[in-house]
Amino acid sequence: MKKIAFFVICVGFPSLIFASASIQESDFIQRVINFVIFVAILWYFAFDSIKGIFVNRRNAISARLQEVQENLHKAKREKETAQKRLEESKEKAKNIVNAAKQEAYLLEQKYNDQIKKDIETLKYALESNIEFERRKITHEAVDELLNKLIQSDDVQLNKEDYVNIITKRIS
């Protein structure tokens, strides 16, 4: 109602103030009535289509807004999923690094133990070899000395001396 009154005031008031002749000599009222009839006919025939256009536009905008909001929610869910996967990957990486460190420590211990055993074995073998070589050199020296004594005519030994030397050599 306020809109209609405002419209009548806006259209009619300037015409009344600025008119130079009386209202009876003009066709203003007929023109206003024709304009009102024109607006009413236009309203009657075009209102539904104009309203439909605006409703369709509003629905299209609403649909686009809904689609954008769905895309936004989808992006947020994907971001959260990616964050979770990133955290899981970091945790797996930490676990892998810890497992690798532990495995390296165990391998180091294993190889250190094996190296110690190998060193002990080599040490024992070396000591045995040294002892064997010492005995071998001693036996060779005794054999050489006995051969010289037996072959030389300077030294005269009796059988008891030979038996004594041989028993010492054997032991």
UniProtKB/Swiss-Prot annotation:
Superkingdom: Bacteria
Q: Give the residue spans that cross the bilayer.
A: 4-24
Q: Does the keyword Ubl conjugation apply?
A: no
Q: Which UniProt keywords apply?
A: ATP synthesis, Cell inner membrane, Cell membrane, CF(0), Hydrogen ion transport, Ion transport, Membrane, Transmembrane, Transmembrane helix, Transport
What compartments host this protein?
Cell inner membrane
Q: What GO molecular function terms would the record report? A: proton-transporting ATP synthase activity, rotational mechanism; proton-transporting ATPase activity, rotational mechanism
Which Pfam families does the annotation name?
ATP-synt_B
Q: Record's GO cellular component, any one?
A: plasma membrane
InterPro entries for this protein: ATP_synth_b/b'su_bac/chlpt (IPR002146), ATP_synthase_B_chain (IPR050059)
Membrane-topology annotation of the record: Single-pass membrane protein
Has UniProt tagged this entry with the keyword Endoplasmic reticulum?
no
The task this protein performs is described as: F(1)F(0) ATP synthase produces ATP from ADP in the presence of a proton or sodium gradient. F-type ATPases consist of two structural domains, F(1) containing the extramembraneous catalytic core and F(0) containing the membrane proton channel, linked together by a central stalk and a peripheral stalk. During catalysis, ATP synthesis in the catalytic domain of F(1) is coupled via a rotary mechanism of the central stalk subunits to proton translocation.
What the record says about family reads: Belongs to the ATPase B chain family.
Which NCBIfam families does the record cross-reference, listed alphabetically?
A: PRK08475.1
Summarize the subunit comment: F-type ATPases have 2 components, F(1) - the catalytic core - and F(0) - the membrane proton channel. F(1) has five subunits: alpha(3), beta(3), gamma(1), delta(1), epsilon(1). F(0) has three main subunits: a(1), b(2) and c(10-14). The alpha and beta chains form an alternating ring which encloses part of the gamma chain. F(1) is attached to F(0) by a central stalk formed by the gamma and epsilon chains, while a peripheral stalk is formed by the delta and b chains.
Question: What name goes with this protein?
Answer: ATP synthase subunit b
Organism annotation: Helicobacter hepaticus (strain ATCC 51449 / 3B1)
